[in-house]
Amino acid sequence: CYSAKGRSKTILQEETLKTALDFFIRKERGDNLQIVFSGGGDPMVSFDRFRMAVDYAFYKAHKEELKLDIDVVTNGSLLDNQAIDYIKEKGIGLVVSFDVLKDVHDTQRSHYDIVASTISKLIENRIGFGIRCTVTPLNVNRLCETIEELHKRFSNIKCIALEAVINKELFSGTDKLREFYDSFIENFTAAKKIGKQYGIDVGNTEYMNAAAFQERSCLGKFVLTPEGNLTACSRISSSNEDFHDDFLYGKVCADSIVIDYDRYNNIMEEADAYLPECKDCMARWHCGGGCLLARKTYSKEYFKEHCRFICRITEIAQNDNELD
């Protein structure tokens, strides 16, 4: 699993959770709020704590007269009947990380049979959910096969996100990263055509962003880690992660919250559409300076290849939108 490095055996303390939720769920923040449970490992590792947090969040939202959407990103291996029933009862949005092809999934994540069985249960229970497939050098040339298998095995699923991995360790040089991105675009484009035949929406973050206008790729987040730290990136799920300290801007304790707003603002200014290198880029207002975590993960030369990839897929998406 690509969040494996961020796995932590630490479980958020109940009082810390309540303090964070009390701070976040307030009328002054707007009428519609969203909470997402995700991170290294899986939110379902501690279902009792997950249920406590959800129940308390909905209680607070009702008290504040707010609409609250709750979503969970899970690898699907721990979604038992109790969890499935609860998710259905509460109307919780669900994304399952699933690489579709058995050999790929078992190599990259493991527990294919368990996850596939869980997906079947979700379909039987008429629970809406999305599929997120991580694309690496292992499966980048098998995206058409991925869509064919998805249709064959789970014909009810009509939406899948194919997301290119961000991991420098998988690419020995910039030429290998460019080769990967070129293969991704070629195979993603072909997979979209197959998906269209089956009524499957084949998406991708960069492709979707082509229809958006944004000054910053990712708005800063109020991310609470198991240790009670606050980070600005949803992929920084524990202090075990690389770049944890780069995104750290606060701390939540049982009865207090400390936020360094200057630090937060500095993080927000590290990547946006106003960077000098973005000035003449055609994708400037769609990618919003690019993912800050990607900027930190890749060296300057590697990130140039990442930018080239974003420009190419943005251009393809815009052409597709014109044809539609």
Task: For the regions a language model picked out, list residue spans one by one.
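Exposed loop/turn and edge beta-strand positions of beta-sandwich/beta-sheet ligand-binding modules
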Residues: D31, C218, E277
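Radical SAM enzyme [4Fe-4S]-AdoMet core and its adjacent flexible, acidic
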Residues: K18, D103-T231, S237-F247
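Radical SAM/AdoMet-radical enzyme domain recognition
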Residues: G6, T10, L17-S38, S46-V165
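N-terminal pre-core extensions flanking Radical SAM catalytic domains
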Residues: C1-K5
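Generic recognition of stable, solvent-exposed alpha-helical segments in well-folded globular domains
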Residues: E15, D48, M52, S117, ...
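Conserved G/P- and acidic residue-centered "switch" motifs that form tight phosphate/ATP-binding loops
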Residues: D42
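Short helix/loop capping segments that flank catalytic or ligand/cofactor-binding pockets
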Residues: A232-C233, G290
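Flexible mid-to-C-terminal extensions adjoining Fe-S/redox cofactors in radical SAM and related proteins
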Residues: N240-D324
